[in-house]
Amino acid sequence: FQDLGVNTLWISPIQKQPDSSWVEWVPPNRTFSGYHGYWPIEPRKIDPRFGKSEEFNSIVKSAHQTETKVILDFVSNHVHQDHPYLRDHKNWFGTVNLPDGRLNIRQWDGDTRLTTWFDEFIPSFDFPSAPVAINQVVEDAMWWMGEYDLDGFRQDAVKHVPHSFWKSLTRSAKIRFPEKNIYQIGETFGSDELIGSYVNPAELDAQFNFSIYFNSRGVFSSDQSKFYDLGNVIAENRSTFGPIHLMDNITRSHDKLRFSGHADGQIELSDCILARWYF
C-alpha cells in the first residue's frame, strides 16, 4: 500500500448480515442478499463470513504499524428487519406507509428524505421522534471505534439522517477520543448545497464529491459532456466548498457501474437499471 501512496483503508460494513435472501420491492423483484454489509442484524457483531474479531484487530494494528489509517463503513440510517432493535423497540422506527396510502420506499428526496425506507424489509430509524435511538446508535459507533482502534468512519446514506444525529455522533467521538484525529466522510447523492450542509466542524469532515464524479465520467468516457462543462462544475464546486477542502474526488462508486463499463460503450440504460445497488 505504501508503494502505491495509499495512506487510508476504507473497510466496507462488517456487521452481521442475514443468512437468507430477500425479494426486492420494485420490479423486476430480484432476489438478493446482504453480501454487501448494509443490512445489519446485530449492532456489535462481526459477520463470521467476513472474519473474526481478533482478525480485524490484527488488520488495524498492522495498518497502524505502517502509518496507514483505517476507517470503517458505518450504517446509521437503517437496519434489516431481523435486527433486535426493530424487535425490541418498534417505536424507534417510522412506518412504511405514507398518509396518502403510498409506500414510503425509495422516496429519496423532498419531504420523505428523512423517513423513506430502502425496502420493505429495511426499516429506517425515526430519529426525530426517538432521541433514545440516537443515543444508542451513537454508542454503537463509539464501541466500534474503541474496540478496534479505528481512525474514523465512512458514513452511509448521510442525507437520510437528520443533522442532530451527526452532531451527536461527532461530539461524542471528540469527547471520547480526544487523542485521535478522527476523520468522517459521508455519502450523499444530491446537490452541492445539500452535500455541503453536512460538512462542518460539528458534523462531517468531508463527503464524496459526486457532482465532479458524474460530470468527469461523462467527459472522459463518452461525448456526453465537454471539458467546458466540467470546468463550470469545478468552479461551482469551489464556490460551494472553497478552494481548500477535504472533499473526496472519486473515479468510481460501488453504488454505480464502473468507469470502464461506460468507457467501452457496452452499457445500455436497461443494464444500468438492472445493476443498481440499494443500501
What are these regions (language model features)?
Residues 126-130, 154-157, 259-272:
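Active-site rim elements
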Residues 60, 64, 68, 139-142, ...:
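Active-site-proximal helices and loops of the catalytic beta/alpha 8
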Residues 1-5, 60, 233-240, 274-279:
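Short amphipathic alpha-helices and their capping/turn segments at secondary-structure boundaries
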